[in-house]
Amino acid sequence: MALRLRLDKPWRPLTAEVVDRLPGQLGVYQIADAKGTIVYIGQAGARTAFGLRSELQREASQRASGHQFRVEVNQQYRTRWFELLMVHQADHGSLPVDNAKNPPPALGRLSPN
């Protein structure tokens, strides 16, 4: 069985109505623009009041309409966040535009192929 590194769940509209139905669980998420280009990869960690729901409520309130998101519930959210960032960097040669503004320290390299 091959290990799946990429987050391949379907995109959902980043709207308050959709986000308010999310679980209050730990995990990671991706934000994409209307064209499907990933602009941010985030995490909902243990210090987040209501996990993925509160993180994406914040994202929805700060971003223009037309953005979309997908999530993965994951108790190892920090490790998974690093994996997703490294896969994106390997696939595209750089971090997503909004992650590049404040990159994580000491991000390793990953060869997902």
PLM regions: where:
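Catalytic cores of nucleic-acid endonucleases
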Residues: 62-75
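Short, compositionally biased low-complexity segments
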Residues: 54-61
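Short, compact, well-ordered microdomains
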Residues: 82-94
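GIY-YIG nuclease catalytic motif and its immediate N-terminal context
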Residues: 1-50, 54, 72-84, 105-113
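Charge-biased low-complexity segments
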Residues: 61-65, 80, 95
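Coupling/hinge elements of helicase-like and P-loop NTPase modules
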Residues: 92-102
